[in-house]
Design a protein with these regions (language model features):
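CBM-like, beta-strand-rich accessory domains located in the C-terminal region of large
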Residues: 46-231
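Amphipathic, alpha-helical segments enriched in basic
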Residues: 5, 9, 14, 44, ...
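Carbohydrate-active enzyme catalytic cores, enriched for enzymes
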Residues: 1-38, 90-91, 209
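Active-site-proximal substrate-binding groove within the catalytic cores of carbohydrate-active enzymes
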Residues: 41
Length: 231
């Protein structure tokens, strides 16, 4: 809309057989004042592997390294049939939302009947990621992944603060439902190091506990005050 102040998000529908495809149906990016908070890592230096049968062994191509769930221990799969369904977009003066069923982006072993991912942005206030799911079985834990270039702090009370160029942000969630942990993603590819001006990214993993055949979760990201995590 010609403005760069406040929150901005973009989300992807489509399918997993698009030009220069990543397995990222339903993923999003989030910026604040035109600076990154939640990211798509992008793609590294092109190699023979990038355009060959081993393409999806590259971590940047995998749904696990996008802002997406791992369902029953199963990531999304490449192919035109692995696609978004039932998409809805709404925008008002105060709110923008995008909703999509991403269940069909996952293979059969995910045992997912429906997985409704909803993004809601309240302009200059917060960004909400809501997941509502129905599974046919619970074989392995399901995990909500967030990728960020921010520094991530999780205190002893499991409060989460992201700190980066865009400022400080609090991630709010149901601590009885989601158990957070972080992975450091080391960057060794020169192109990625240059793109992010750093040698590491962070993946936040929210494991759904206990496992549930059906349920709903919510992640809220909002600007944080410059106080300690325990305040």
């Amino acid at each position: 809309e010609g403005k760069s102040d406040g929150f901005f998000f973009a989300a992807k529908g489509g399918n997993n057989q698009e030009s220069h495809n990543h397995n990222d149906v339903g993923s999003c990016i989030l910026y604040y004042n035109a600076l990154p908070v939640l990211i798509d890592a992008g793609v590294g230096t092109y190699t023979r592997q990038t355009f060959g049968p081993e393409r999806y062994t590259i971590w940047t191509m995998q749904s696990d390294y996008h802002n997406l769930p791992l369902i029953n221990g199963t990531p999304q799969k490449n192919g035109r049939e692995f696609a978004a369904h039932s998409q809805q977009y709404k925008a008002t003066a105060k709110t923008v939302s995008y909703q999509v069923d991403i269940a069909r982006a996952y293979p059969q072993e995910a045992n997912v009947k429906s997985w409704i991912r909803n993004y809601t942005l309240h302009r200059k206030k917060d960004f909400i990621i809501t997941d509502k799911w129905k599974l046919s079985a619970c074989n392995e834990p399901s995990v909500l992944n967030l990728m960020t270039c921010c520094e991530v702090e999780i205190d002893r009370n499991k409060n989460i603060i992201l700190t980066g160029e865009a400022g400080r942000f609090r991630v709010e969630y149901d601590k009885k439902l989601l158990s957070p942990a972080t992975d450091t993603v080391e960057l060794t590819d020169p192109k990625l190091i240059h793109s992010w001006n750093r040698k590491k990214l962070t993946r936040i993993r929210f494991t759904i506990v206990p496992q549930q055949i059906s349920g709903e979760s919510k992640l809220v990201i909002r600007k944080a005050q410059y106080k300690t995590l325990n305040d």
